[in-house]
A protein has these predicted regions:
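N-proximal low-complexity "stem/linker" segments adjacent to membrane-targeting elements
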Residues: 59, 70-74, 78-80, 88-118, ...
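Glycine-rich, basic loop-to-helix element that forms the pyrophosphate-binding segment
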Residues: 263-279
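Glycine-rich phosphate-binding loop signature in dinucleotide/nucleotide-binding domains
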Residues: 279-285, 312
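Short beta-strand-to-loop acidic/aromatic patch adjacent to the donor-nucleotide binding site
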Residues: 283-296
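Conserved donor NDP-sugar-binding/catalytic core segment of glycosyltransferases
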Residues: 296-346
């Protein structure tokens, strides 16, 4: 029996979009039925049958269900109409179990969901590497009326996720509606991993307004501040970020965590190399994160990257995804590989 001391750490929490932007709702909640791959035994082993099934999934149309921005009650809370079903099996609210199993010291996770509204049902699911889903557990809010409250905890092992898969939860509101006040994925980790690390965010820019707006986003995120050591801007443009009309607000938000470094135009690689050099010289942050300047940042992504790095089995490069700025729920690529003999990147098949 192990005598190693452990502590509870938050891995990720339920979040809603900061600005209630309807374009990004699909990244946080899903109002449609899950369109996962049909079980191979139902489709058959014939290639033509598989292709036909995959085409049917791609061509399936939306039911037209909508979520009103006013249903987002806070950064972590969401209101459901009476009898409304809703899934949190989404990019930001599902839990990437297979990645945590493979790359971190975490072996089991606990999901806690806080729901208000009698008769509301929480159901936990998992997906497998082939894409089909399995129901894991469920719970119902007992009592009467819209003020009835339920706090449900589910212990979920990561052992089944050898070759892929996610955990997530769905909620169906009762007759009086429901409010999903929050949810948290936590784990017991070794005591020497109790404290979270900090990060230097390194931004190379020639776009003063866009980079200043990004700095403002980082400074406005109160929950992010304990994780930030320094935000370094390598300013390589003719027009300076400090001259942007957005800069005073950004400077006020970040305070002494902000550092602007003016240098010649050395390209992206030269800018990020300078950021890494300054981070190593300073030596006060656990990690250095390279970030584009022309992006809208979800601050929770930085927190989750730091948390994943803290709990990795070995020192690990933690990558982040990028979405289309003009079609904000469109993911450019879920993963990439580098061919070492030609140093050329490709999307993972």
């Amino acid at each position: 029996m192990s005598t190693t001391s452990t502590v509870t750490r938050l891995l990720q929490r339920q979040i809603m979009p900061i600005d209630r932007d309807t374009d990004v709702f699909p990244l946080y909640v899903d109002l449609e039925e899950a369109k996962l791959d049909t079980d191979r035994h139902a489709v058959g082993g014939d290639k033509a049958a598989k292709d036909l099934n995959n085409a049917a999934i791609r061509q399936s149309t939306s039911t037209g269900k909508k979520l009103h921005p006013d249903q987002i009650r806070s950064r972590t809370a969401l209101e459901l109409r009476p009898s409304q079903p809703l899934s949190f099996g989404t990019y930001f609210n599902a839990f990437p179990a297979s990645y945590w199993r493979r790359h971190t010291v975490v072996t089991d996770v606990d999901l806690t969901v806080e729901v208000v509204g009698a008769g509301s049902v929480v159901t936990v699911y998992k997906s497998m590497a082939r894409g089909h889903a399995q129901r894991v557990d469920s719970a119902t809010v007992e009592g009467e009326g819209q003020d009835a409250r339920g706090s449900f905890s589910f212990s979920l092992p990561l052992k089944p996720f050898v070759d892929g898969g996610w955990y997530w939860y769905d909620v169906v509101a009762g007759d009086h509606g429901a409010t999903v006040e929050g949810a948290a994925w936590t784990a017991q980790v070794p005591a020497d991993r109790a404290e979270h690390g900090t990060v230097d965010v390194c931004i190379t820019t020639m776009l003063p307004d866009m980079s200043a707006q990004l700095l403002g986003q980082l400074g406005d995120a109160e929950e992010l501040q304990p994780y930030l050591d320094t935000v370094m801007v390598m300013d390589q443009g003719k027009d300076k970020v400090t001259d942007s009309s957005y800069f005073p607000a950004a400077e006020a938000g970040l305070g002494d965590k902000l550092r602007v470094i003016v240098q010649g135009n050395l390209g992206g690689s030269g800018g990020y190399a300078r950021g890494q050099l300054e981070s190593v010289r300073k030596g006060t942050a656990t990690y250095a994160m390279m970030m584009d300047d022309d992006v809208v940042c979800e601050p929770e992504g930085i927190i989750r990257a730091v948390t994943f790095g803290d709990l990795a089995k070995r020192p690990t490069i933690v990558g982040g995804h990028m979405f289309n700025l003009f079609s904000r729920a469109e993911l450019h690529s879920f993963g990439e590989i580098v061919q070492p003999w030609r140093f050329w990147r490709l999307r993972v098949p």
